[in-house]
């Protein structure tokens, strides 16, 4: 079990998948949201939670005022845990899409998001994450001002952000590194 840190569901516990996932620690999640909310008010934002795992990042965003979160998770057991967590918390605005992150991002959208949260398994190659970041921009997921946060192991190669993103200072918490960037201009 882990818990929601802040907002209307703050302090409530949520389930985590039984094996094969590495939920973001409370400390890292709290720091992540402190960094983002120092620059952006979450109220009313549209959020994309990639490699959602337990859904903790997206649920934290909903608890703190985001209008909507699209959770993307390929593992069926993890997706079932996300669905149960959404129901247990009773937060509106949650949509769960079961499927591979690369396929969902490649399919595109006509509704860009304001915040992208990505916590890929540490064994996902940095080049694959780089490709996802590039596809977000070319497939309509981002707009000027979109913020992206990617959680990686400190042992993983740093990300190569596509043109049009301004990196924010990265943060390191033990063996976890947060890489953040802001979209400078609309999709091309």
UniProtKB/Swiss-Prot annotation:
EC assignment: 2.1.1.-, 2.1.1.171
GO biological process: rRNA methylation
Effect of residue 177 to A: Shows reduced nuclear localization
Coiled coil regions in record: none
Catalytic activity field: guanosine(966) in 16S rRNA + S-adenosyl-L-methionine = N(2)-methylguanosine(966) in 16S rRNA + S-adenosyl-L-homocysteine + H(+)
One protein family per Pfam: Cons_hypoth95
Region span, SAM-MT-fold: 25-188
Gene Ontology MF terms: methyltransferase activity; nucleic acid binding
Highest rank taxon of the organism: Bacteria
Main function: SAM-dependent methyltransferase that binds both to RNA and DNA. Specifically methylates the guanine in position 966 of 16S rRNA in the 30S particle. In addition, can methylate and modulate host cellular DNA within an infected mammalian cell, altering the host epigenetic machinery. Binds to specific host DNA sequences and methylates cytosines predominantly in a non-CpG context.
Assigned protein family: Belongs to the methyltransferase superfamily.
Modifications made to the protein after synthesis: Glycosylated. Phosphorylated. In vitro, is phosphorylated by multiple mycobacterial kinases (PknA, PknB, PknD, PknH, PknJ and PknL) and by mammalian kinases.
UniProt-recorded name of the protein: RNA/DNA methyltransferase Rv2966c
Annotated effect of mutating residue 171 to A: Shows reduced nuclear localization
Leftover remarks: Can complement rsmD-deleted E.coli cells.
Keywords (A to Z) from UniProt: Host cytoplasm, Host nucleus, Methyltransferase, rRNA processing, S-adenosyl-L-methionine, Secreted, Transferase, Virulence
Free-text domain note: Forms a two-domain structure with a short hairpin domain at the N-terminus and a large C-terminal domain with the S-adenosylmethionine-MT fold. The N-terminal domain helps target recognition and is important for binding RNA and DNA substrates. The C-terminal residues dictate the nuclear localization.
Any GO CC annotation of this UniProt entry: host cell cytoplasm
PANTHER family the record matches: METHYLTRANSFERASE
Region (Linker): 17-24
Region (Beta-hairpin): 1-16
Oligomer status and interactors: Monomer. Within host cells, interacts with histones H3 and H4.
Organism: Mycobacterium tuberculosis (strain ATCC 25618 / H37Rv)
Subcellular location, record wording: Secreted; Host cytoplasm; Host nucleus; Host nucleus, Host nucleolus
Ways its activity is controlled: Phosphorylation stimulates DNA binding and DNA methyltransferase activity, but does not influence secretion. Exists in a compact, folded state at both pH 7.5 and pH 4.0, the acidic pH that mycobacterial proteins may encounter in the host lysosomal or endosomal compartments. The protein is more compact and stable at pH 4.0 than pH 7.5.
């Amino acid at each position: 079990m882990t818990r929601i840190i802040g907002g209307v569901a703050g302090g409530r516990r949520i389930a985590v998948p039984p094996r094969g996932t590495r939920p973001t620690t409370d400390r890292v999640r709290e720091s992540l949201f402190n960094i983002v909310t120092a620059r952006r008010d979450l109220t009313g934002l549209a959020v994309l939670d990639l490699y959602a795992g337990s859904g903790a990042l997206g649920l934290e965003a909903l608890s703190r005022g985001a209008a909507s979160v699209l959770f993307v998770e390929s593992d069926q057991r993890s997706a079932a845990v996300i669905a149960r967590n959404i129901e247990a918390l009773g937060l509106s605005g949650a949509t769960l899409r079961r499927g591979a992150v690369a396929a969902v991002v490649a399919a595109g959208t006509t509704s860009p998001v304001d915040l992208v949260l990505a916590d890929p398994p540490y064994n996902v190659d940095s080049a694959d994450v780089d490709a996802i970041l590039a596809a977000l921009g070319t497939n309509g997921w981002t707009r000027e001002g979109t913020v992206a946060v990617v959680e990686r192991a400190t042992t993983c190669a740093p990300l190569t952000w596509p043109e049009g993103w301004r990196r924010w200072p990265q943060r390191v918490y033990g063996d976890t590194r947060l890489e953040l960037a802001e979209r400078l201009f609309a999709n091309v």
